[in-house]
Curated annotation (Swiss-Prot):
Any Pfam family: Atracotoxin
Name this protein carries in UniProt: Delta-hexatoxin-Iw1a
Similarity comment: family membership: Belongs to the neurotoxin 06 (delta-actx) family.
Function: Inhibits tetrodotoxin-sensitive sodium channels by binding to site 3. It slows the inactivation, causes a prolongation of action potential duration resulting in repetitive firing in autonomic and motor nerve fibers. Does not depolarize the resting potential. Does not affect tetrodotoxin-resistant sodium channels. This lethal neurotoxin is active on both insect and mammalian voltage-gated sodium channels (Nav).
InterPro entries the UniProt entry points to: Delta-hexatoxin (IPR008017)
Major subcellular location class: secreted
Length: 42
């Protein structure tokens, strides 16, 4: 999993849900699959 400083792209399909949550919290990205990523196997 990438470090939380490496933000997800706005439409990136994330395998690191927490990375997306940090990015969203800091208004640096808005992954569409943040929630589904929690249950996704990469």
């Amino acid at each position: 999993c990438a470090k939380k400083r490496n933000w997800c792209g706005k439409n990136e399909d994330c395998c690191c849900p927490m990375k997306c949550i940090y990015a969203w919290y800091n208004q640096q990205g808005s992954c569409q699959s943040t929630i589904t990523g929690l249950f996704k196997k990469c």
